[in-house]
Design a protein with these regions (language model features):
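Core catalytic lobe of class I
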Residues: 1-127
Length: 127
């Protein structure tokens, strides 16, 4: 099955049969501390750690159900949440022994911080 789906991920995953996908790539909003609301007004959450984890956890649970035993999941985050998500969510649901790689996507564009070093990378966890 070669398909790309762009919609409410949790609703979509809940309606999928179990064990059908070879690859899942999740790129959730980053935890910025702001109130986030989707374009359609669905799925509002406070972009803070506790809300972020409780918002992300069900997606990861459902992703495990629909992923084949031999499948791979990629979770794309930034430096604010990658380690929390790895230990508190991904290792718990997928198992630490299934961790494959921590991919660092480095780039050279973006703003320059006045009070700190600017982040010039994103993090992708692979299980």
């Amino acid at each position: 099955m070669r398909e790309v789906h762009h919609n409410n991920a949790l609703d979509f995953l809940k309606n999928c049969p179990s064990g059908i996908y070879d690859t899942i790539y999740i790129d959730p909003p980053f935890n910025t501390g702001l109130t986030r609301k989707s374009a359609r007004g669905v799925g509002q959450y406070q972009d803070k750690f506790d809300d972020f984890c409780s918002w992300l956890y069900p997606f990861i649970e459902e992703s495990k159900r629909v992923l084949k035993e031999t499948g791979t999941i990629f979770l794309h985050l930034d430096q604010n949440e990658v380690f929390h998500a790895k230990v508190l969510i991904m290792d718990e649901i997928y198992g630490r022994h299934n961790f494959v790689n921590h991919i660092v996507w480095s780039y050279d564009y973006g703003g320059r911080g006045k009070n700190c070093w600017p982040s010039k990378h994103d993090d992708i966890l692979m299980y």
